[in-house]
Every structure is written in structure tokens, then in C-alpha cells.
Amino acid sequence: GKAGVVNVHLGDSPRCMDLIERVVEETEIPASQILPTHVNRNEKLFCKAIEYALKGGNVDFTGNEDIDYWETVCDEVRVCSGIRRMMQAGVDPKHITISSDGQGSLPLYNEKGEFLGMGVGQSSCLLKEVKECVQKADIPLEIAISTITSNPARILELKGKGRIQEGYDADLCILSSELELMEVIAKG
């Protein structure tokens, strides 16, 4: 089984995370049960996500295959710089994850914000984002890789996942020293 965590997809509403904050502040539901995703959608939302994570909440960045496009055309906070900024603000990196919306619908826009059509999210963006964290933002590899391995496994309470440890599933990606994918082993 897995934990009863509610994954909340955030949009461009000016209310940002107001309703999530109210649930955590006004009910018995702990922040650990709500995982807001797409927290890097825009600067205002990202700043609210820092506040939420500083209070112990978990936050999820959306990784992208075309990193430059989403930062420049869509005004998203680049994942590597966002994680670096969160850490500089004092957020425990154990509260940060990156997900891909892998195989989900992905709206595409031009420089004017006009809708161009639909694409497909790629899970391959996860490794690309980890590489950027390490190579462009100087985030230690063990922290960067934990955002797609041990952190989500712990937050979602996925037994036997997210670590290289006796008794765990041997799900491994073998990487080169340049962080290029060389081999995948599932349930080794």
C-alpha cells in the first residue's frame, strides 16, 4: 500500500495555495497529507511554496523535457534554480520532489501565450532536471537524486522503494560520471 497523500495540481490562480493553507491551519489534516505539485508554475506560487515547505509541507516541482521553453516562454521557475533558492531559504531538501507528468497531456504555447496544441509529458525529463541541479546549480548529487528517488518513496510510503538497501527492490539506473543513463535494472 501507499500513504493517503492528496496530490494537488496547482494552476495560475492568484489565490496560489490559499485553500491548502486553510486546510492545514483549520483542520486536523497535517501538511504531510497534501502534496502540491506544479509549484514552479510561476514566481508568486513558487514563493508561497517556500513558505509551505518551511512549515514542514512537502512540495513537488514539475520537470520538463524542454527546460528553456518552460522558463522563457511560460515564465516557470526553472527547477534547478528553484530548488537552490528553497535550500537557501532554509527548506529541508527532504521535503522537495520532482515529478514529470510523464505521458500526461502537455499544453504548448507560443511566445505570446497563444495555445499551439497538445504535447505529451516525458518521464525522461527527471534525469535531465537532476543533471541541471548538479551541473548548473551546484546542488550535491545526493540531494538532487533524492528528489526523484528516496523523497517521493518516503512521502508516499512506498515500501521497499527509493533506496539501495537490503530488502528493497533493486530498481537502479546506472549513470556515467557525466550523469548519462547507461543501464536500467528493475527489480534486479
Locate the predicted segments by residue:
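A cross-kingdom feature marking charged/low-complexity
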Residues: 176-184
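Residue-level "edge-of-site" marker
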Residues: 65, 147, 180
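His/Asp/Glu-enriched, well-ordered alpha-helical/loop segment
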Residues: 88-168, 172-174
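Active-site core of metal-dependent hydrolases
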Residues: 1-109, 115-116
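Glycine-centered positions in the ABC transporter ATPase nucleotide-binding domain
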Residues: 187-188
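Residue-level recognition of conserved beta-strand edge/terminus positions
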Residues: 62, 173-176
